[in-house]
Amino acid sequence: MSSEESGKSQSGKKKKRRVRYGEEEIESVEIRYFPNPAPNRDYYVQIRLPELTFKDPVSGYPDFAVATMVYIPDARIVDLKTLKLYFNSFRDKYFSHERITNELFDELLKGLEPKGALLMMEFNPRGNVSTRVVTTTDDAFLEQARNVLELPVTRPAF
């Protein structure tokens, strides 16, 4: 490991770690939105982010998830690069599965203001338990998204 990677200079004194350009982008990211190129047509957008990482709030161990978002744009669509950077900003933050799902969904709804949306988070097994958390703007959109995109999601019957 180089002295730069270890955070120590050759004299053994603690050295200030250099912030890399990707880290700067992630730290300062704001999700951008663009005008919908076809505002008079309803169409579905499916976005899959397979590498979401964050930390468990109890143990501090890393957690991993695949995020799948489906939405019908209204006036805006999301910029994928800034969305990716925004998702990367969660890497060193602490969340429960339910909290991160709802926080991400709320942020996207605020910026997109879509006609309908769904966010499905599939978390890697932890302690031999798999978790899937789904949130949606309404039950009708859940059914639309399921039928159109063949999502393996149904509303549980309680």
Predicted regions and their residues:
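N-terminal intrinsically disordered, cationic/polar leader segments
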Residues: 2-158
